[in-house]
């Protein structure tokens, strides 16, 4: 990447980074000193101020924190602050691993000391794996008398007289509440069991809506970020191979960073695409497939989703089937892959860095015979490229093998660094990564550089939330391998006659004294399939692609009530691509539009997507049994594409009244004026306006009914002769969780009806 581009990126990001750092308080100061001036306020409020300034958390073991206190503390350490705050009060405190544990002082006289063993309730609480559980509430049932477990799961408190016939209640979020009779028992060692219902996870579904996993009437499979980054691929989609049931990923032959085809549960159409829709943080990423060209001008290509940095991914949800992605309309008829990216986290500044090196060699190759030499004993036609001639012996057998003689060891360097920082109001995330790859065929390169900044903040008493992110991707690839026979070096590497000398064709060009330039050396000809010297294709049929991509995303939400909120988001995704072709003189003329002087092509393309939506979200319980989740919204998607293309043969004087151009000089002024030269400005714009809604009704956490509907008004149907102006996409689904109805239900049979 050039210094100019880097300087522009620095000029863009430095003010943002500086403003974010200025927004944060100094962590070092808040850890060492505390300053509080308060008069006649609740002790609980003072404790909250201490938590904010020290990043410690209070654990309260039966202390009344509602009483009012007055304090005037300035620049004191945490220990000094606690001594001042609790001076003269019946409160003990201690600091342990970032926790401040407070409890009542227990004063026992000698007269009652002997009875303490009979009135002291104590014990330890662990989970099913034997790990101490912190924060378990231990209360005498029906009262507020009790305490909570400390960092080691221990608890103790004084049992008041006359309550021996009561019961102890052990409760903690995510665990099943336990009730045990006290009686004569004074020591309780309790094992908490996970509550399968409370521990139910949520998944990210269409439009970024989070829903309970058990309530879904369709299949959603989640993939954690670790599974994507464990074995990194330049296109992270390839890392999903084998991790999602029913997902078939076909990586292209273009090499590192090449496009991949993702098909869920089989092909859906012969003539139309069966590829899944990609969704990044709730916003669809529409793939504007680049024209692959004609049979003589084909080009390997990458994919917009391949530009995403795997290290920026938090999680991936795979929505299989039309019902799962109905809220996206026809674009997600083949399913959707929903990607959630990372954001800053509250706490101290943290930085992570990673580096990896990957080596690549061909895994599966055709089996080649090495017994018969060049020629064909049954036919003299085309025998120069066949390998069914006379038997070879050790003396005349060069033992040519594409694996060791043509392919090289590919190397991919992947480096990334990320920084996360923030407080309870403001969090930021920054990351940068680079991929530098050398392919397994000569002169094949792929380079990509990613820069991301994201900031989330909340204000208006935490009712309003703002999420802003910006990304810049610079990508360059060179000589991505084409599929088929034209411009594909593997054709010559595989068909090369077995007894010919491969070392001779390594020198792929020879100087022609007549033409006064270097020309291709390939003694066996094109074999009727436009076959060329593989090294000539690698070094003299150059195809280079350069892309700069900007993504800006902003989202704002406001909590009107605890069960009602509204949100809106807007995203711009713009790519500028420059693609060049340089075919040198003596390339087979079938590939250069019959020119002896070569071919040149240059295309500059810009595509831009602007997406915006607005949602009203309702999530409300009615009584103990009913739950309703409703999402209503509208969206607009605007797509723009513009291209300027010049491609044609370099003038060689074959046309009348046309002067010959200069061989191997690649510019548009040197192109022939023949009809085979293309000079084209192309472009289009389309827009889709939509309304959508979903409703999910749950009963007793066991029965769920889900309805969705979407109506699209695409611009393609806006013409006066269109018989239909819009499309309507409804869906209905339901599920029954038998484990909520039948006790001890085997896990494999929990979901009875899920359609």
Where are these regions (language model features)?
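Outer-membrane beta-barrel transmembrane domain signature of Gram-negative proteins
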Residues: 392-420, 584, 590, 594-702
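A surface-exposed, glycine/aromatic-enriched loop/edge motif typical of exported proteins
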Residues: 366-385, 473-524, 581, 636-662, ...
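Residues embedded in well-ordered regular secondary structure
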Residues: 213, 222, 229, 243-246, ...
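N-terminal periplasmic "start-of-domain" segments of outer-membrane beta-barrel proteins
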Residues: 24-35, 57-70, 131, 137-154, ...
């Amino acid at each position: 990447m050039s210094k100019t581009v880097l300087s522009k990126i620095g000029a863009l990001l430095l003010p943002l980074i500086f403003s974010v750092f200025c927004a944060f308080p100094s962590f070092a100061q808040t850890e060492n000193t505390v300053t509080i001036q308060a008069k006649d306020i609740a002790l609980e409020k003072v404790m909250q101020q201490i938590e904010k300034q020290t990043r410690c958390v209070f654990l309260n073991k039966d202390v009344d924190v509602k009483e009012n206190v007055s304090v005037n503390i300035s620049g004191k350490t945490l220990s000094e602050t606690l001594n001042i705050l609790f001076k003269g009060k019946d409160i003990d405190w201690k600091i342990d691993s970032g926790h401040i544990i407070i409890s009542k002082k227990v004063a026992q006289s000698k007269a009652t000391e002997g009875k303490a063993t009979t009135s002291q309730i104590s014990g330890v609480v662990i989970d099913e794996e034997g790990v101490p559980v912190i924060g378990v509430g231990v209360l005498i049932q029906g009262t507020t008398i009790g305490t909570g477990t400390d960092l080691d799961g221990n608890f103790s408190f004084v049992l008041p007289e006359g309550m021996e016939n009561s019961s102890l209640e052990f409760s903690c979020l995510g665990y099943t509440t336990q009730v045990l009779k006290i009686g004569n028992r004074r020591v309780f060692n309790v094992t908490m069991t996970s509550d399968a219902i409370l521990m139910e996870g949520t998944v990210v579904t269409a439009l970024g809506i989070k829903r309970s996993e058990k309530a879904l009437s369709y299949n959603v499979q989640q993939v954690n970020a670790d599974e994507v980054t464990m074995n990194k691929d330049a296109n992270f989609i390839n890392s999903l191979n084998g991790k999602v049931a029913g997902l078939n990923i076909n990586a292209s032959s273009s090499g590192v960073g090449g496009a991949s085809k993702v098909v869920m549960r089989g092909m859906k159409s012969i003539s139309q695409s069966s590829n899944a829709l990609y969704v990044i943080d709730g916003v669809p990423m529409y793939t504007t497939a680049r024209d692959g060209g004609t049979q003589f001008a084909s080009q390997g290509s990458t994919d917009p989703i391949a530009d995403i940095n795997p290290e920026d991914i938090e999680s991936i949800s795979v929505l299989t089937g039309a019902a799962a992605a109905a809220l996206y309309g026809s674009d997600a008829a083949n399913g959707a892959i929903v990607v959630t990216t990372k954001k800053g986290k509250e706490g101290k500044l943290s930085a992570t860095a990673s580096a990896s090196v990957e080596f690549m060699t061909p895994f599966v190759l055709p089996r080649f015979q090495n017994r018969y030499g060049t020629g064909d004993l049954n036919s003299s036609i085309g025998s120069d490229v066949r390998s069914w001639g006379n038997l070879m012996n050790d003396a005349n057998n060069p033992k040519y093998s594409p694996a060791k003689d043509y392919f090289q060891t590919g190397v991919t360097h992947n480096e990334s660094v990320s920084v996360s920082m923030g407080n309870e109001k403001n969090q930021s995330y920054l990351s940068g990564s680079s991929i530098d790859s050398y392919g397994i065929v000569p002169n094949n390169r792929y380079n990509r550089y990613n820069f991301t900044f994201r900031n989330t903040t909340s204000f208006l008493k935490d009712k309003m939330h703002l999420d802003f992110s910006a990304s810049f991707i610079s990508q360059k690839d060179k000589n991505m391998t084409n599929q088929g026979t034209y411009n594909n070096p593997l054709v010559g590497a595989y068909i090369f006659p077995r007894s010919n000398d491969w070392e001779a064709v390594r020198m792929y060009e020879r100087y022609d004294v007549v033409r006064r330039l270097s020309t291709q050396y390939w003694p066996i000809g094109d074999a009727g399939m436009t076959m060329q010297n593989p090294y000539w294709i690698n070094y003299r049929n150059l195809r280079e692609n350069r892309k700069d991509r900007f993504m800006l995303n902003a989202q704002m939400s406001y909590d009107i009530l605890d069960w009602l909120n509204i949100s809106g988001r807007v995203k711009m995704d713009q790519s500028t691509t420059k693609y060049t072709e340089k075919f040198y003189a003596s390339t087979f003329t079938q590939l250069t539009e019959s020119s002896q002087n070569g071919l040149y092509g240059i295309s500059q393309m810009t595509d831009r997507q602007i997406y915006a939506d607005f949602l009203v979200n309702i999530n409300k319980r009615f009584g103990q049994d009913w739950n309703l989740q409703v999402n209503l919204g509208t969206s607009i998607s605007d797509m723009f594409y513009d291209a300027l293309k010049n491609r044609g043969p370099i003038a060689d004087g074959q046309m009348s009244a046309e002067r010959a151009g200069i061989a191997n000089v690649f510019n548009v002024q040197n192109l022939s004026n023949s009809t085979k030269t293309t000079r084209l400005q192309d472009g289009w714009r389309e827009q889709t306006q939509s309304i959508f809604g979903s409703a999910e009704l749950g009963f007793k956490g066991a029965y769920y009914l889900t309805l969705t509907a979407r109506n699209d008004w695409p611009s393609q149907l806006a013409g006066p002769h269109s018989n239909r102006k819009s499309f309507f996409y409804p869906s209905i689904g339901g599920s029954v969780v038998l484990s909520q109805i039948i006790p001890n239900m085997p896990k494999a049979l929990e979901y009875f009806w899920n359609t």
